[in-house]
């Protein structure tokens, strides 16, 4: 099976579905990750917090850990819009790689870039038979994430963790919050289905 994960920034995919992707690789699937933005950003004082070069280097390392082929977009962080440029870039990958399963941002995510990429993903992947939405942060939304599809990542948590830790610049900025949060999420999801750790998704479509 050919699998595509779509994220707005370097780190979104690792946080949201890194365990599942690592499992797909172990199962022999062809796994690709498309990251829409160059992912560098500045703070409100216009000081660079993370450069595009640093983000790309860390993203490449993270995908190497997961064993995933990385496809890099060229959009600027916080400037992503639901436009034909983005739609066509995703559609080209879907058609060239003959994608059968796509992981995409949750539509209820309040992050501007995440919303735009989620909409573009749904539009461009409308003919992909299996689609799962993931959460890559803990931001509150007025919408409910309806997690109804679980993947056992017990044997793949360490790879997911290492792929997150590959984003050293972000780890320096946030400390261990990411690791702690997603570890707890994985443990809680695992308890619901009787395994040690799991990732949970909202199904858009699942053709059998």
Question: Predicted segments — roles?
Answer:
Residues 1-4, 23, 27, 46, ...:
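Metal-dependent de-N-acetylase/amidase catalytic core
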Residues 31, 70, 131:
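Hydrophobic anchor at the start of a short beta-strand
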Residues 34-36, 73, 104, 134:
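Short glycine/serine/threonine-enriched helix-capping/active-site loop
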Residues 36, 64-76:
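A conserved beta-strand->alpha-helix junction
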